[in-house]
Amino acid sequence: MDELSFAKYHGTGNDFVMIEDLGDQVALNPSLIAAVCHRGFGVGADGLIRVTKSAEADFFMDYHNADGSTAEMCGNGIRCLGKLVYERGLTHETELDVETRAGIKHLSLHTRGDEVETVTVDMGAPAFEKASIPMMGPAWEKFLQQPLEIEGVTFKASAVSMGNPHLVLVVEGEPVAVDVQRLGPQLEKHQLFPERTNVEFVVPDGDALAVRVWERGIGETMACGTGACAVVVAASEAGISARRADVRFHGGTLDVDWRSDGRVFLTGPAVRVFEGRLDPASMGERLES
């Protein structure tokens, strides 16, 4: 494969390798994606986003986790996509529809001059039924504020789908005290979740929610957009948060608004870090050696 042009973006520290491929010429595979996202041998990122054309919307977001697996949706990543297509002149519209594997999402770009500073995404309505998450158990049953034991510790846990699965756990004390590296992998691969799950550890912090997140197929990340939405939904259902709240991650703060019509809106920044070219063959050789 020839050299690939790419750009590095992040949304509240959640970083992505972005590849513009409107001609549908770039062939990706899990091993190449993992090599590109490898922080020692590749560019380094939480995920890779290929921007392509869509027959149903303005663009399609082909999103992959850092391990090469395919994911349905990424709230931070889709904001970065909005910034990329606008600032590269691929669109002159500030209202966009982007197709994802979790459906079409509407973006509102908030600009200053020629630059996109923040993006609001209509993330759609959350789903609670186990069949929608997916989660083991009766298809119609919900899992909200239920006890979940791991390593002898019982958490109050809720399962929510924002187009991808999330397990939200309310914890006591400071977020820094949570052993995310130990608990995250076990919960991601818990037998209750046949397709694995993202995991959020939540501490109420005044009018805000402090969160650490373990992402499926990635590990602990600086932030998670769909996770922020799942956290506000779960915390609101538990009576420990308003339906609109700031969600604080290591990488920054996201605004989440769960409106009365059931839809969740996510607002946050998108930042272009740098652009470059990479040699897939050379990266693969270093990774295998």
Predicted stretch roles:
Residues 1-115, 168-289:
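A glycine-rich beta-to-alpha transition motif near the start of alpha/beta enzyme domains, typified by
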Residues 114, 118-126:
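Membrane helix-loop-helix hairpins that form the core translocation module of multi-pass transporters
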Residues 126-127, 272:
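Active-site/binding-pocket entry motifs
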Residues 157, 165-168:
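Selected transmembrane alpha-helices and immediately adjacent juxtamembrane segments
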